[in-house]
């Protein structure tokens, strides 16, 4: 029979390391967060062989006193909290005192530090958690932590490390997130002597975004802000024309801490409404300032999961902030820029001789070799990521060689299957209040257009005061009809159209049972089905907004939408129905219309709440300015844009 014993401290630290230190990126995260908590304004991260050989973090923070250096390597020794009350008002990134001893237990760790006013600094060397020496040493104010031979005493962990390229991607992702979280700090990441990422540390979030996403992307992001008594929201989101194939480019920060929160991600998408294409996601960098008492960060070892009080209120604020900022924008894509992007995507090869970083990267002067300020960067045109990408932020774009054109995936519109989302228990009805405020989108000033032609029975040409406009006739009429249906669907007071021959609908037993429970939702949109035999329903009348020839397919699709979700928001349901009906009833491509019909369509479009996107998020029209046309014909030359121009935004 085995007996209960107290584990040795070194073994306990190795066990804790299994939770906190998963890979080299975890070491970078924990050490950089310590540097941030120490009040650093400049942090340099140097790695070799993706961090498995060496990770070195140098900061200019307040350092560690000589008599506290050894104590820093003991479990649960921390300067961040003093008592139980502090645990409910955490204002620092670290607070448990686990990271440094956990890292030391699975590596060879060297720590060099000094505090302001001290006659000398301190050097500590530990191997596998055992302190080998603590000696006085010369050091500038701040701390330098060098971690070598990571996992040397836990070979099983090394077996599960991915390729160096993959591990480096994770490190780049971590540093990028921290750079966006703290634009007031200058970050520099150097891998095997080459600078991979750098932020200026000016305190301007847009400049930090430019350093990570690139200058062109930063210029296509708009500022958002909102607040109430409990929350203060600020940040940037991309215009609908700048999207990615997954949510990995959404960065949320609470009090400077990067978090993952499905409901807040959902609130961001709700703020965009129908302005995004199906399967596309925005770039977003959103800072949320909150009383620490309302956020519990002591939930997960990585501290990326946070429990938030008044979460529904926060969701509404985020959605409202984005929706209000988008209302102020004229969301007509720049046609000339889209043509340029298309040309780059269609290249079969892109010459690349050195490691690519980001589009339109700004440069720093080179100094002597191997100094942190050195950089060697290759410009490239940003490609849209594949939907299967699982590496986050710009890490994958930083590492991949650009030898293939990007693949665009324009998904067919389908009813949303919320059962397959990350949180299948999400109660969509809980955000009805916020969604109701966002459903009505106010139009920005729409240009006065003079129609003069049609091309291929698909595109309308019109002239405005500031140039040429090309309109997708299907998308335009789809938007017009969508807003008409949005008004009429659910108006159950309107008269119903009686059917001479009723329709009978039959469903499998389990679906029929679920439909009985959700029948009130169909009645909310003017569809009254009555039970008729076993697993059958009869329809004797239909709402006037539904054409008789569409009844059978339309009712089945409406029922499918109900069956696909566990919880249904009636506002969402009505919106999906309006999208479905508007798409079916709009003119298609290769359909010629007369001048009167074209002018009438443009007038109806100008009266829409949101005339710039179809309900699926595709652009309705694109714009060539007079300046664009002159550039195309080389009448004028385009000027280069510098980082300093960001101050204009």
UniProtKB/Swiss-Prot annotation:
Gene Ontology terms for molecular function: ATP binding; ATP hydrolysis activity; ATP-dependent DNA damage sensor activity; mismatched DNA binding
Superkingdom: Bacteria
GO biological process: one example: mismatch repair
A cellular-component GO term for this protein: mismatch repair complex
SMART domains per the UniProt record, alphabetical: DNA_mis_repair, MutL_C
CDD domains: HATPase_MutL-MLH-PMS-like, MutL_Trans
Record key words, sorted: DNA damage, DNA repair
InterPro entries (UniProt xref): DNA_mismatch_repair_CS (IPR014762), DNA_mismatch_repair_MutL (IPR020667), DNA_mismatch_S5_2-like (IPR013507), HATPase_C_sf (IPR036890), MutL/Mlh/PMS (IPR002099), MutL/Mlh/Pms-like (IPR038973), MutL_C (IPR014790), MutL_C_dimsub (IPR042120)
The keyword DNA repair belongs to this UniProt entry's keyword annotation: yes
Function statement: This protein is involved in the repair of mismatches in DNA. It is required for dam-dependent methyl-directed DNA mismatch repair. May act as a 'molecular matchmaker', a protein that promotes the formation of a stable complex between two or more DNA-binding proteins in an ATP-dependent manner without itself being part of a final effector complex.
Cross-referenced PANTHER family: DNA MISMATCH REPAIR PROTEIN MLH, PMS, MUTL, DNA MISMATCH REPAIR PROTEIN MLH1
Assigned protein family: Belongs to the DNA mismatch repair MutL/HexB family.
Name assigned to this protein: DNA mismatch repair protein MutL
């Amino acid at each position: 029979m085995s007996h209960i014993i107290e584990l040795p401290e070194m073994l306990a630290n190795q066990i804790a390391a299994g939770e906190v230190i998963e890979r080299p990126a975890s070491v970078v995260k924990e050490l950089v967060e310590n540097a941030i908590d120490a009040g650093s304004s400049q942090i340099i991260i140097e790695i070799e062989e993706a961090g498995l050989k060496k990770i070195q973090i140098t900061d200019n923070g307040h350092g560690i006193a000589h008599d506290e250096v050894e104590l820093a390597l003991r479990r649960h020794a921390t300067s961040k909290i003093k008592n139980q009350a502090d645990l409910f008002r955490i204002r620092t990134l670290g607070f448990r005192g686990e990271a440094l001893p956990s890292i030391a237990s699975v590596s060879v760790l060297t720590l060099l530090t000094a505090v302001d006013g001290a006659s000398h600094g301190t050097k500590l060397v530990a191997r596998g958690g055992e302190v080998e020496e603590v000696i006085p040493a010369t050091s500038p104010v701040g701390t330098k932590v060098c971690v070598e031979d990571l996992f040397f005493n836990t070979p099983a962990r090394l077996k599960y490390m991915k390729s160096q390229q993959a591990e480096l991607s994770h490190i780049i992702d971590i540093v990028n997130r921290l750079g966006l979280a703290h634009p007031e700090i200058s970050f520099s990441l150097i891998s095997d002597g080459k600078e991979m990422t750098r932020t200026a540390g000016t305190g301007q979030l847009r400049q930090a975004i430019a350093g990570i996403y690139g200058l062109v992307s930063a210029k296509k992001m708009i500022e958002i802000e909102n607040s109430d008594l409990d929350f203060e929201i600020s940040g940037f989101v991309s215009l609908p024309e700048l999207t990615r194939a997954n949510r990995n480019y959404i960065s949320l920060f609470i009090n400077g801490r990067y978090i993952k929160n499905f409901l807040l991600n959902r609130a961001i998408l709700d703020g965009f409404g129908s302005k995004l294409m199906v399967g596309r996601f925005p770039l977003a960098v959103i800072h949320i300032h909150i009383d620490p008492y309302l956020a519990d960060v002591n939930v997960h070892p990585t501290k990326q999961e946070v429990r938030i009080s008044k979460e529904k209120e926060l969701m509404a604020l985020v959605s409202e902030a984005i929706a209000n900022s988008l209302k102020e924008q004229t969301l007509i894509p720049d046609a000339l820029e889209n043509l340029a992007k298309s040309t780059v995507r269609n290249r079969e090869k892109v010459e690349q001789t050195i490691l690519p970083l980001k589009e339109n990267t700004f440069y720093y002067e080179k100094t002597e070799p191997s100094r942190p300020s050195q950089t060697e960067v290759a410009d490239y045109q940003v490609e849209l990521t594949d939907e299967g990408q699982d590496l986050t932020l710009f890490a994958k774009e930083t590492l991949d060689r650009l030898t293939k054109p990007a693949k665009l995936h324009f998904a067919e519109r389908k009813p949303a299957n919320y059962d397959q989302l990350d949180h299948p228990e999400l109660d969509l009805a809980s955000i009805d209040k916020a969604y109701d405020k966002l459903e009505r989108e106010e139009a920005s000033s729409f240009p006065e257009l003079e129609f003069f032609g049609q091309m291929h029975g698909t595109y309308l040409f019109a002239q405005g005061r500031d140039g040429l406009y090309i309109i997708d006739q299907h998308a335009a009429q789809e938007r017009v009809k969508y807003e008409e249906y949005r008004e009429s669907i659910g108006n159950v007071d309107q008269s119903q159209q009686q059917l001479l021959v009723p329709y009978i609908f039959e469903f499998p037993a389990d679906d029929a049972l679920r439909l009985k429970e959700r029948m009130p939702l169909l009645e909310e949109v003017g569809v009254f089905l009555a039970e008729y035999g076993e697993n059958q329903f009869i329809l004797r009348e239909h709402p006037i907004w539904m054409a008789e020839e569409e009844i059978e397919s339309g009712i089945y699709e409406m029922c499918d939408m109900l069956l696909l979700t566990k919880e249904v928001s009636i506002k969402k349901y009505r919106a999906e129905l309006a999208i479905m009906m508007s798409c079916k009833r709009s003119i298609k491509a290769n359909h010629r219309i007369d001048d009167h019909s074209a002018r009438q369509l443009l007038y109806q479009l100008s009266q829409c709440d949101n005339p710039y996107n179809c309900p699926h998020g595709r652009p309705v029209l694109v714009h060539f300015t007079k300046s664009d046309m002159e550039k195309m014909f080389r009448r004028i030359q385009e000027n280069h844009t510098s980082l300093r121009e960001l101050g204009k935004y």
